[in-house]
Amino acid sequence: MAHALRSDLRNVAIVAHVDHGKTTLVDAMLRQTGSFGEHAHVDERAMDSNDLEREKGITILAKNTAITYKGKHAQGKEITINVIDTPGHADFGGEVERGLSMVDGVVLLVDASEGPLPQTRFVLRKALEAKLPVILLVNKTDRPDARIAEVEEEAHDLLLGLASDLVDDVPDLDVDALLDVPVVYASGRAGAASRNRPADGSLPDNDDLEPLFEAILEHVPAPEYDDEHPLQAWVTNLDSSPFLGRLALLRVFNGTLKKGQTVAWVRADGTHQNARITELLKTRALERYPAESAGPGDIVAIAGFENITIGETLSLIHI
């Protein structure tokens, strides 16, 4: 097996309880990287999606966000950080597991006052089961009722408890590695982050999100693939477009996927059929756009598969 890395790519899930500030944080990440216009915001773009679809005929609001990072920790490269939206509680168990299957690391975002809530426990357990590295992000450090050190300790206790529970169930689980968790302190509203713990109720001692980007690039591994392996892509979610019909959201694990390509579609019942990719869409900020091809680690949407469903795979046709 010839292992290779997509060093220009990171796939990460941000796990957070509702109202802990995930949308505001992702908004700030997009703005600071210039991933979309300076005056646009996540919620504004989301509300505009129907108008955008009508205007462009192909733009669909993505289920993931693609941040284009060219900052000082990119070492002269342009790095795409795909942020996958993962439901924050157990009611969406299957969707949580599928979302985590698309990523190589997790940012656990907790409110500096409320701390980790019970709903977070389920998602975090699934992430640890999958041996995904975790970054702890304590958000809203400037809340008047912030209790930063206590919340940090609560999050570490939660991680330790979950990891200890999993030791007997998950083979080769490296508990020490899982618990070696970097901590970032942030205010998504202020667009500020630091590795230094601020005083309760204070902003981080840094005026941008570079420490968060650095933590993601350092601790979330680049997608690994076998450059001699044929196409291998897995459908993890579905979407629809008034113009393209059913869309399959998938991650490419090996090989290359191309618009217009005819591939082997492996159905849930084990049968195979050949089908043609009529459209391939990548994500930029919050919008999907047409692309010609996708490689290992890429998360894309494809059209042309009318009855495709979650869990099915695409591979090369065997002649």
Model-predicted segments: where are they?
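Structural and coupling elements of P-loop NTPases
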Residues: 1-317
